[in-house]
């Protein structure tokens, strides 16, 4: 019986990696620059979703049963790309001109540990701190820590609680080889295949995953609907939104905001993003809306915006120069951020509160997520979706405002049929789809703009930009990748009901 290479690799990954390195170094002193082709080899072995699913998922395993050296898969967000750097023996000369590769090989014989320096080629690795994708999935970390059977490990893990957003979140140290750390960005959600190493005093109680390869983890794999399917699903979702918001225009506007996606960004200009401010909201309405959105949007965080909350602690990632504290809004691309202003009243902001407002304004208007250090700061691009729920006009710079009903709706009976619910989820997976404007539509849009300006001088380039952006979102809501006249005219009509900020 022939065993598939993927099955053989899962059963004994270190044996495969040892043979691969030994063959690569045969007859010559190793050059340890780059990944050695290991990442490509592993990616090819697990090139299909069927093969990848055979790899045990770290989030589904009982931690007490995990053993050093086994192959694991893990999805998470990169909280910090600068979590450590170390040198180690990347290869050793076991006989004259016969070299043994040591990358990913976590056990050494006594003889190999006491070799002369001339018989060792040094390698280096960089560490990332990976945690749960905010708003997506959590683990009962206390129970898991108990599985390790050591109170001292449990205590040491608390050292990194400042990097975790919730008490039941977990952190993993991911070690990168051959420059792979340069391909990863902070806040990026990644899907990693690697070699597991059990927590120890050496790792300060953190589990370790030695990265073999990774890919971007946008969201759980789903099948976006076809245009025919989207046309059927769309009105069903709008029906639920309208029940909560009480207005068809507000429901349509919310749908477009949930499908927004930054497609291009230059200094001072963000294309594709769409921040909606729903006004006339109550706390009860917010609660109902969140309960409707939560099963549909796989990454969603709720942030109250009031004086007490703004003054309480930073909403931005903050470093003291030694360690990086996470924040509630250090989130991965594609996350929906719901800003709840319904409890906002007059008051005085302290220094933290002022910085939080500045941070939120930059996040909304520029899609910049700012990290603050003692004497500097830096920003990373953040492709997030944002809706603001408030009584009156928001204190934050939303693109448009739209009034909803305001009174508390009756209990919403959301679909319990799993297939229909999955269809709804798949619909909003279209947020990262791109709808383009064909050449013939560009001429139509330009002529329409010129004609509109003759009758209404208040229509300007900002209005035109909003019309174009919303026509793209409208096309996406029907599963179409090309904008039509119908989409553009529908967007123009919708904008007439908005307050453009």
UniProtKB/Swiss-Prot annotation:
Listed transmembrane segments:
none
A GO CC annotation recorded here is:
chromatin
Major location (coarse): cytoplasm
> Which residues belong to the signal peptide in this entry?
none
Q: Which terms are listed as keywords in the entry?
A: Cytoplasm, Nucleus
Q: Which GO terms describe its biological process?
A: DNA-templated DNA replication; nuclear DNA replication
Any Pfam family from its record, for instance, is MCM_bind
One annotated GO molecular function: chromatin binding
Q: Does the keyword Nucleus apply?
A: yes
Q: Which InterPro entries match?
A: MCM_complex-bd
Cellular localisation: Cytoplasm; Nucleus
The record, for PANTHER family, names: MINI-CHROMOSOME MAINTENANCE COMPLEX-BINDING PROTEIN
What family does this chain come from, according to its entry? Belongs to the UPF0616 family.
Its protein name is UPF0616 protein C1687.04
Per the UniProt record, the source organism is Schizosaccharomyces pombe (strain 972 / ATCC 24843) (Fission yeast)
């Amino acid at each position: 019986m022939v065993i598939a290479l993927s099955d053989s690799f899962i059963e004994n990954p270190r044996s495969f990696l040892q043979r691969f390195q030994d063959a690569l170094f045969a007859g010559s002193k190793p050059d340890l620059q780059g990944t050695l082709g290991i990442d490509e080899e592993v990616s090819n072995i697990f090139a299909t979703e069927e093969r990848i699913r055979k790899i045990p998922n770290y989030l589904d395993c009982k931690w007490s049963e995990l053993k050093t050296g086994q192959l694991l898969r893990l999805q998470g967000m990169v909280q910090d790309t600068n979590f450590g750097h170390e040198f180690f023996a990347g290869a050793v000369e076991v006989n004259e001109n016969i070299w043994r590769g040591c990358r990913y090989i976590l056990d050494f014989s006594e003889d190999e540990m006491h070799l002369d320096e001339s018989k060792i080629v040094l390698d280096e690795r960089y560490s990332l701190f990976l945690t749960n994708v905010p708003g997506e999935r959590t683990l009962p970390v206390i129970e898991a820590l108990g599985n390790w059977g050591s109170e001292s490990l449990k205590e040491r893990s608390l050292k990194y609680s400042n990097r975790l957003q919730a008490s039941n979140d977990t952190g993993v140290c991911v070690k990168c080889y051959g420059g792979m750390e340069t391909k990863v960005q902070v806040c990026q959600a990644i899907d990693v295949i690697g070699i597991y190493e059990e927590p120890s005093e050496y790792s300060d109680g953190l589990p370790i995953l030695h990265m073999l390869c990774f890919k971007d983890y946008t969201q759980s794999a789903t099948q976006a609907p076809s245009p025919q399917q989207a046309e059927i699903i769309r009105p069903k979702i709008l029906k639920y939104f309208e029940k909560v918001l009480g207005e068809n225009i507000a429901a349509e506007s919310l749908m477009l905001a949930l499908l927004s996606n930054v497609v291009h960004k230059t200094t001072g200009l963000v294309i594709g993003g769409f921040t909606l401010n729903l006004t006339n909201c109550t706390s009860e309405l917010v609660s109902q809306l969140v309960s409707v959105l939560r099963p549909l949007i796989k990454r969603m965080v709720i942030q109250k915006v009031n004086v007490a909350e703004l003054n309480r602690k930073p909403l931005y990632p903050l470093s003291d120069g030694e360690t990086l504290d996470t924040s509630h809004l250090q989130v991965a691309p594609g996350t929906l951020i719901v800003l709840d202003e319904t409890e906002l009243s007059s008051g005085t902001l302290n220094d933290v509160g002022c910085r939080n407002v500045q941070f939120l304004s930059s996040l909304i208007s520029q899609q910049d997520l700012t990290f603050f250090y003692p004497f500097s700061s830096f920003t990373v691009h953040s492709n997030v979706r944002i809706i603001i729920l408030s009584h009156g006009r928001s204190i934050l710079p939303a693109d448009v405002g739209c009034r909803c009903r305001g009174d508390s709706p009756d209990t919403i009976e959301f679909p319990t049929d799993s297939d229909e619910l999955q269809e709804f989820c798949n619909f909003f997976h279209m947020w990262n789809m791109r709808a383009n404007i064909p050449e013939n539509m560009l001429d139509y849009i330009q002529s329409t703009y010129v004609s509109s300006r003759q009758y209404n001088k208040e229509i300007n380039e900002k209005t035109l930009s909003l019309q174009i952006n919303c026509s793209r979102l409208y096309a996406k809501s029907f599963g179409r990748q090309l904008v039509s006249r119908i989409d553009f005219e529908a967007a123009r009509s919708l904008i007439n009901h908005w307050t453009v900020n």
